[in-house]
């Protein structure tokens, strides 16, 4: 029984990919706690070596932000690029759609997610970033397309 609970917790808290913070800029001064900022992060597609995505999103500061209780705005931008060789023969076996990145955007209920689609006809990887909540999400989204191989 303990193993079942542990496995459930691991699945619940599993993260498809880890992002590396590239940098940030402050956009709103806060008297107490860190300033609100726009963060630029990079993560590699875990299933497609040679593709890296860069994502920018706002991070709320202040006292709530300092202790992890703030809710970040549900807006993000993404740009994915081929940064190395991609084995095009393996792309037809990819799950599509497939979540490749997820990050908490509030204490419990809100996440920013990146989902990858494989457009077989056009030989392109499409990455969609959006924010959702347990009850309702946001229609704000951004996509990036990485053309792969010969047609």
Task: Briefly describe each language-model feature range.
Residues 58-107:
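Structured domain cores in non-transmembrane regions
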Residues 1-6:
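Bacterial N-terminal signal peptides that target proteins for export
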Residues 10-11:
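A structural signal for the main folded, soluble domain(s) of proteins
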Residues 20-22, 31, 86-151:
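Low-complexity intrinsically disordered segments
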Residues 42, 55, 82, 117, ...:
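Hydrophobic side chains in beta-strands
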Residues 20-79:
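N-terminal secretory signal peptides
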Residues 14-16:
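N-terminal signal peptide c-region/cleavage motif recognized by signal peptidases
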């Amino acid at each position: 029984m303990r193993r079942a609970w542990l496995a459930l917790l691991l699945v619940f808290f599993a993260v498809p990919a880890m992002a590396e913070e590239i940098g940030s800029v402050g956009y709103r001064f806060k008297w107490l706690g860190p300033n609100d900022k726009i963060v630029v992060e990079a993560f590699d597609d875990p299933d497609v070596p040679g593709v890296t995505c860069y994502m920018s999103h706002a991070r709320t500061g202040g006292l709530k932000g300092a202790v992890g209780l703030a809710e970040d705005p549900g807006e993000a931008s993404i740009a994915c690029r081929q940064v190395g060789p991609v084995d095009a023969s393996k792309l037809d076996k990819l799950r599509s759609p497939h979540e490749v990145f997820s990050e908490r955007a509030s204490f419990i209920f809100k996440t920013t997610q990146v989902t990858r689609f494989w457009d077989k006809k056009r030989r392109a990887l499409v990455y969609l970033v959006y924010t959702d909540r347990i009850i309702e999400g946001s229609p704000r989204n951004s996509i990036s397309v990485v053309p792969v191989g010969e047609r």
